[in-house]
Amino acid sequence: MGGLPTEATIAHVLVSKYADHLPLYRQSQILARAGLDLHRAVLADWVGKAAFHLKPVVDRLTDHLKRSSKLFMDETTAPVLDPGRGKTKTGYLWALARDDRPWGGEDPPGVVYFYAPGRAGQNAETFLTGFDGILQIDGYQGYNRLTKPTRKGGNPIRVAHCWAHARRKLNEVFDRDRSEIAAEGLRRIAGIYAVEADIRGISPGQRLSARQTHSAPLVAAFGDWLQAERRKVSAKSRLGEKLTYIHNHWDGLQTFLADGRVEIDNNRVENMIRPIALNRKNSLFAGHDEGGIAWGRIASLIETCKINGVEPFAYLKATLTAIANGHPQNHIEYLLPWNFKPSS
C-alpha cells in the first residue's frame, strides 16, 4: 500500500488501539484480510508521529488541569520492552485527573497520563510542578514528599486520602478471617458513606455543612474506635497491619470534612485507570519508553473525550486535520476535547 495515511486512517488506528484495546498486530491482521498490507511496525510509526504532533494539545490540557483547586492522582504499571535485555521492564503511567461534577464545579472533567520508567515519588513531584491545590491520592508512600516544605515545583500540597482504600483493607481481613473487629469497622465506614450518597451533586457549601453535622461525629467516633482496637491486637497481625495503615493516613482521611469540594475517596481516578489496565492486558507491553509516552498522550485525549461525552474518533480526526492544516499554536486551547464541535 503506497502513499500517506489520511488523518481519518490514523485516528482509526489510535481509537482501535487505545479506546477499543485492539493491539497493532491484530489491526494489521484485520487490514490484511481486506487486502491492505500494513505491517504493525508501520502502524506503530503512525502512532508515534501522531503522539508527537498531539503533544501541544496534551501539554495545554495538562496546564488546564494544574490550574485546578483539587485534583486526583493514581498510578498503574505499564510494561515496556527493554531493548538492551530483550525483556520487559516495569514502567508506570500516572493519571492526573479533574472531576468536579459531584459538587457542581464548572470546569470540565479531564485526565492526563504521564509515563515514567519507575514508581519513585520524584516522578509525581515532577508531573505536579506548578500545582498547589488539594491532591486526592491513595496511601502510596511515594506521595509523602509532596507534603514537605522541601517540595520541588511548588508549595507543600495538602492531601486527601481515600476511605475506599481504608474500607478495602478491612474487607481483606474480614473476607479471610471473618474478624468481628473488621466487620465493625466496615459498618462504621458504611455509615460515613451513607452521608455522601445523600449529598452528591449539591454545592460545596451544602456538602461541607452536611459533613460537619453528620459525618464529623461519625469520623470522630471511628477514630476513637480505631485507637481502642489497635491497643487490643498485635501490630504484626493481619488486622493490626490494616488498622495501622488507617492510623497512618488519619489526617488525610479527615480532609474531606473541611472542604466540600473534596471527595471521600479516590474512586474517580481509579475508574480512569481501568482503560490503561485493559490496554495493558491486550497489548502486553509498549515497545520502548517513547511508546509509553505515546500511550499516555493518546490515552489522555481519548479518555478526556469519553468523560466529556465527545466521540474520540471524530475528535482525533478533526484535531489531526487541524494540526496538519497549520492550526496556530496560540489557539491550541480550541483543540481541547471539551471545545470540540462535531461537523454536521
At which residue positions do the language-model features occur?
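Catalytic center-proximal scaffold of phosphoryl-transfer enzymes
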Residues: M1-S344
